[in-house]
Amino acid sequence: MLPEAVAAMTKLLSEPGNPSSLHASGRRARRAVEESRERVARAVGCGSAEVVFTAGGTEANNIAVKGIAWDQRSKDPRRIRVVAGSTEHHAVLDPVRWLGESEGFEVTWIKSDNEGRITPDALREALGDDPTDVGLVSVILANNEVGTINDIAALTAVTREFGIRFHTDAVQAPAWLDLNFSELGVCAMSISGHKVGGPHGIGALIISRDCHVTPLIHGGGQERDVRSGTLDAPAIVGFATALEISAERRAETVARVGALRDDLVTRVMQIAPEAIFTGAKKDRLANNAHFVFPGCLGDSLLMLLDAQGVECSVGSACNAGVPQPSHVRLAMGADDDAARSTLRFSLGSTTSQSDIDKLIEVLPSAIERAKRAGVPKLTTAPVRA
């Protein structure tokens, strides 16, 4: 967390109060919440009334995907289809699947290109000749695995022709991109605190005033009757503080971290020429470096590097202890083995040159050992969008 966010949050933790209460401590907490709401709104280019606080990006995505789909179907029974990108984060992927499996919706996945990008032409293909049955389109703004940035404004220009609601998962974006909700053309956008140096367990769903959402949680309706539950005022203040500071420092951070990322990519390719740098080359998050290391299981590399003090990620989940291929890489056209041989290095505002040097020092031996271990055959079918 950013030190400023820790300080702001700690101060309010010592002054407890329920923002929904009318007594003095409640009014003090409510003032902190509403001031934070205004700060969040300024940082992402929306009105303060459009900010609905949630318990994080996953809840925000679930509220948007399920709530908008339900609302649109209730108003027009023809709208029984949900269209989403094949490279979505599981916080969108899984709710969309659930709507299809449990709620009777039809699901269409938008094809990705080989850089992880969702294009307007691919969206038109997914919508089909008669998109009057589509209640919602959801496409991630910046991919969490490979860092590719989608042109959301170009995509909403397509859905606007048919009056289709559009949601975007923008959780990865605020620290690295100039985000303006009013210019994207979406009706809902999800963001999260811990991605900007704020606390875990807090986020927001930005919802346009004309967008109606059927709530998931009932019991108080504290947030526009969209989300119920006592608000976590300290976390909200920490979130707003971090978001505000990250926006103020964005240009400098992007330039510095982007240079470190480019150095990392160049040096990795020098010591491992067989490695493949994946994702978009230009329209990409400045902090993201994603590779395929042929012949190496991504999970093996992760553990070997972790033992040397280097923390990184793979784009896979483990099912019963069996590493699964990255659904993002599969959607980009990779085969099963390549999709299990991925590794993502995510840089942050505190990443230094010495961190890059450390990685380059220990990576060759990790690759050598991972190659000796090999890539075991899958024993279960890979999960695809």
What residue ranges belong to the model's regions?
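Pyridoxal 5′-phosphate
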Residues: M1-A385
